């Protein structure tokens, strides 16, 4: 009888531990890839934007050297382009087509790969266009042309 009771108690503890393991995500499951962190930054840009249409990732610059700590801010540089989807639709930007002659923005800043910590520090500036076959990024009256 005592063995049966101990076995039943052990079974309950095993069940509780199993449920706890399923509920508490592991640290590795909480880490985002570099691209996922950038897509999260694009989502944040769309949430905070007052513009009519959503933006979608157009180009992602090379990720920085590997860093084991997902909570450490990583430098990031990417380009987004305006889509045909109105912002209020809340449609995932990846499902939206790019708008012909839509606005293009160059974004720089830092992201973390940790899903729990969510510090993003991103600044986006509109790309003013192409000058003599070169892509130019302008901020106020100062432009940098590449290419």
Curated annotation (Swiss-Prot):
Tree of life domain: Eukaryota
GO molecular function ontology, one term from the record: lipopolysaccharide binding
Function: Microbicidal activity. Active against E.coli, Listeria monocytogenes and C.albicans, in vitro.
Protein name: Protegrin-2
Signal peptide region: 1-29
Gene3D superfamilies reported in the protein's UniProt record: 3.10.450.10
Family: Belongs to the cathelicidin family.
The gene coding this protein: NPG2
Propeptide: 30-130
Compartment(s) where it occurs, according to its Swiss-Prot or TrEMBL record: Secreted
Location of the region described as Disordered in the Swiss-Prot/TrEMBL record: 61-80
